[in-house]
UniProtKB/Swiss-Prot annotation:
Disulfide bonds: none annotated. Its main location: other. Glycans are attached at residues 67, 88, 112, 136, 245, 305. Belongs to the mam3/map4 family. Sequence repeats lie at residues 148-180, 181-218. Residues 1-23 form the signal peptide. The gene is pfl7. InterPro entries: DIPSY (IPR021746), S_pombe_Mam3/Map4 (IPR051905). GO terms for biological process: flocculation. Keywords: Glycoprotein, Repeat, Signal. It comes from Schizosaccharomyces pombe (strain 972 / ATCC 24843). This is Putative cell-type specific agglutination protein pfl7. Residues 207-358 form the DIPSY domain.
Length: 358
């Protein structure tokens, strides 16, 4: 299959998956990418003002823009009725004196019995058994039970954690968000960035305070970032950058810098999970094929020496890179390279160049 393809780097944040060469539908693929995976998902990360013990931390569901932070005031508690308390609980009072109250279960109470849960619990109580309660009877209010241990799951943004709250009251449970203990929050940025964690410590009791919500943004670091340089171009040195002023998207917008112009050189990083090059500003390059050959696709493989190889998916043939007179990058198949006049028609300024990460 003779093919001539241009390398297009569109400034969008959709994930570019490998294209099926026999069922290529770019519009559907792009829509599918937008629905399934975004190039720059935002995960909310919660920090206290420190973080230090004694600072109240809450987990709001609000999000903020990248590279910004915002303070959220918070004061409050949550009440749960005693009817939601599990049976056979041990209640801890503020004086640390345990009061054990066993709620009668179906095995110890005859049918049609009613257990009220609205009256205070005495310091001592005896649990009615099946031998002391007649059918259709009502259990005295002195056998009511008060608050106990509550387990609550809090969901905030992309973080889900479970923590246990313990408190004592007459017929309500005060749930403080958060309670004593450690909460581990995982922050993630991009699809292949190393995952890092931070541990926040908070204290029990209802408090007022501020919480700082920080949303990490995509970005490169010295370990994973690089420039793209072309070896073999007629202009030396020759770097790769994005030309956002291209009017025709089919012509591509991945260009090489002209002589003496290095200000527009972009910084990239390589995502090995999808074998694609991404920019550090959270833009995943979308490599499109030239419209002369809409049924083919190609893979990009990063070699151990930092160079990149372009392989056509349908045939497994290694593609070659060329630079046009205007500095645009082109990919051609071996068949096209062998055609008489094919290369001359385009007028490349450099043939068989190599894309190198450095």
């Amino acid at each position: 299959m003779n093919s001539l393809k241009s390398l297009c780097l569109k400034c969008i944040v959709t994930l570019c998956l490998l294209v099926n060469a026999f069922a290529f539908d770019y519009a559907s693929l792009q829509e599918q990418d937008e629905n399934l995976l975004a190039a720059c998902p935002q995960y909310i990360t919660i920090y206290t003002n420190g973080p230090v013990p004694g600072t109240t931390t809450i987990y709001p569901t609000s999000n903020v823009a990248s590279n910004t932070s915002e303070n959220y005031p918070y004061t409050g508690s949550k009440s749960l009725s005693s009817s939601s308390i599990l049976s056979n609980s041990t209640i801890s009072t503020s004086s640390s004196t345990p009061i054990t109250a066993s709620v009668p279960t179906s095995s110890s109470i005859l049918s049609n019995s009613t257990i009220p849960t609205t009256s205070p619990v005495p310091t001592t109580s005896s649990t009615p058994t099946s031998s002391s309660i007649l059918s259709n009877s009502t259990i005295p209010s002195s056998s009511s039970i008060s608050a106990s241990t509550i387990t609550t799951t809090i969901i905030s943004g992309s973080t889900q954690f479970t923590t246990t709250f313990v408190d004592q009251s007459i017929d309500t449970v005060e749930v403080v968000i958060p309670t004593a203990g450690y909460i581990t929050t995982t922050l993630t940025s991009g699809s292949s960035y190393p995952v890092s964690t931070t541990t926040l410590q908070t204290v029990s009791g209802t408090q007022s305070g501020l919480v700082e919500v920080i949303t990490p943004s995509c970005g490169c670091n010295p370990e994973n970032s690089f420039h793209l340089r072309l070896v073999g171009d007629s202009i030396n040195p020759s770097y790769v950058y994005k030309n956002t002023n291209v009017s025709d998207p089919d012509e591509g917008n991945m260009y090489t810098s002209t002589e003496g112009n290095t200000e527009a050189v972009n910084v990239f990083y390589y995502d090995p999970t999808v074998e694609r090059i991404l920019t550090c500003d959270c833009v995943r390059p979308v490599y499109t094929i030239y419209t002369d050959d809409p049924d083919s696709s190609f893979d990009i493989i990063k070699n151990n020496n930092g160079t990149f190889t372009f392989v056509e998916s349908s045939s497994g043939e290694i593609q070659t890179l060329h630079v046009s007179q205007y500095g645009a990058l082109w990919i051609t198949s071996p068949e096209y390279d062998g055609e008489t006049g094919g290369m001359d028609d385009v007028g490349f300024r450099a043939d068989d160049v190599i894309l190198v990460a450095y």
